[in-house]
Curated annotation (Swiss-Prot):
NCBIfam families: S6. Gene3D superfamilies: 3.30.70.60. GO terms for biological process: translation. InterPro entries: Ribosomal_bS6, Ribosomal_bS6_sf, Ribosomal_S6_plastid/chlpt, Transl_elong_EF1B/ribsomal_bS6. Pfam families: Ribosomal_S6. It comes from Nitratidesulfovibrio vulgaris (strain ATCC 29579 / DSM 644 / CCUG 34227 / NCIMB 8303 / VKM B-1760 / Hildenborough). This is Small ribosomal subunit protein bS6. The gene is rpsF. Belongs to the bacterial ribosomal protein bS6 family. Binds together with bS18 to 16S ribosomal RNA. One of its GO terms (cellular component) is ribosome. One of its GO terms (molecular function) is structural constituent of ribosome. Keywords: Ribonucleoprotein, Ribosomal protein, RNA-binding, rRNA-binding.
Length: 101
């Protein structure tokens, strides 16, 4: 299993309970596909550099998880069909890095 990170930009109009329900759904997808959620880091409401869907603010959430590669495809499919998610990006995190003295 590999370690991944997904950064989500959510609509500022999503209520807190709707936002939590969405994140619960996404973490459920990861766990259903034999992955495990490490952390869900809420960065909060931030100003955007340019309008996204006519909004100048967005709510950022960073998800970190370990999962097989097929899980990422399923997670991104669910993200694409979900309302309230403006943008997202998923990256594979590096394996353990050795420090050079």
């Amino acid at each position: 299993m590999r370690k991944f990170e997904t950064l989500l930009l959510l609509s500022p109009e999503l209520a807190a309970d709707a936002r939590e329900a969405l994140l619960t759904t996404l973490s459920g997808v990861v766990e259903r596909e034999q992955g495990s959620m490490i952390t869900a880091d809420h960065w909060g409401m931030r100003d955007l550099a340019y309008p996204v869907r006519k909004q100048m603010r967005g709510y950022y959430v960073r998800l970190e998880y370990t999962a097989p590669g097929a899980t990422v495809a399923e997670l991104e499919r669910i993200i694409r069909i979900s309302d309230g998610i403006f943008k997202f990006v998923t990256v594979k995190l590096a394996d353990a890095v050795e420090e050079v003295a």
